[in-house]
Amino acid sequence: MNYVQRIRDLREDTDHTQTQIAEFLGTSQTMYARYERGANEMPIRHLIALCQYYQVSADYILGFTDVKKPLPSSEIYSHKK
């Protein structure tokens, strides 16, 4: 799944409008709609803001994993041993 679908799904799953998310990001609803359609690439600052807003990892939004939250650092270190 690509980030276009993920950002739409996250927004819809939390019952937010495009306008609400656009206001949070400090952009227009029109521009945010373009992100959701894939007509414009989303700036990294907006990706980071959405990760914080939805409490998910960038890897999840970008489609690299289906795990929404990153592993706690204590678990990452225990797997390296």
Question: Can you describe what each PLM-predicted range is?
Answer:
Residues 26, 45-60:
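DNA major-groove recognition helix of helix-turn-helix/homeodomain DNA-binding modules
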Residues 62-81:
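Short, charged recognition helix plus adjacent turn
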Residues 5-24, 49:
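Short basic helix-loop element that most often maps to the first helix and adjoining turn
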Residues 7, 21-22, 32-35, 61:
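Conserved hydrophobic/aromatic packing and binding residues within compact polymer-binding modules
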Residues 36, 54, 65:
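DNA major-groove recognition helix of helix-turn-helix
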Residues 1-5, 69-71:
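A detector for short, charged/polar N-terminal pre-domain segments
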Residues 25-41:
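Recognition helix of helix-turn-helix/homeodomain-like DNA-binding domains
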